[in-house]
């Protein structure tokens, strides 16, 4: 697979990463998880050159890192492990639909304890990228970021990054310690970061990690109606997936499919290739627990979109419905 680096100073990774969240959390929770398949998907990812594996302590809650750790046992040197801190579970079933209820926690003492817990769960002595999951509105970002910087100084993290932040917040963090990456929702139907965050990151050599790069499966053509969403799936609670909005948004998926058919690729590959084309250090992290979807996603690294293809995709209208 083609490679790039996480920003100008970060580690080398494949241009397509892997988000591990869905192996333990959030999507299709009524279906039992098959850990052996998830482990094999991680191994398959490494074989395909998908080396950036993204998780978080709160996913599961607190089981996704363990799964990633088991999958990478004996393969640690082949992977670039990215995990996150800054959210904590306060009730495993207290959220909507019985989902975990989580809230931000950016207190430095929480970060200091959390990195050690993450390393234990992951079975490693360091993570390659330690990310602030969300900024805690009750804690100055300088204090939280300083605690992440301590993890670097202690050799527990090689690099640190941010998630879902504004340019102002990036600047405040940069004044304390270099920012290697910013993770944001970014796809053909969520393009907010193009206004300010993406240009700033490119100007300052910061990598951008788009999560939900396939619009939570929608851009890949996985479903065309609300009723096709699995029961106990968090997408059933999101505005864009409500039936009226979903029907209005089908034109977006259709346009992606038209480009895919024209160039002999899949819709998922087109959506991911569009993201890779947005900058030299943009590394999408699509999530999957299915071998065939992983292979499909990895194949996006070989898809070259022409200027005409990019223009057609850029012209796709904004979606109907808010993100949350």
Predicted regions span which residues?
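Conserved beta-strand positions
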Residues: 18-20, 55, 129-132, 162, ...
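N-terminal small/glycine-rich loop or linker at the start of catalytic domains
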Residues: 9-30, 82-102, 126, 131
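Beta/alpha (TIM)-barrel catalytic core signal, keyed to glycine-rich beta->alpha loops juxtaposed to Asp/Glu
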Residues: 3, 135-137, 141-324
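Short, acidic/polar
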Residues: 31-45, 104-122, 166-170
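N-terminal binding-site loop/beta-alpha segment at the start of enzyme catalytic domains
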Residues: 1-80, 231, 322
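Active-site groove signature of glycoside hydrolases
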Residues: 119-136
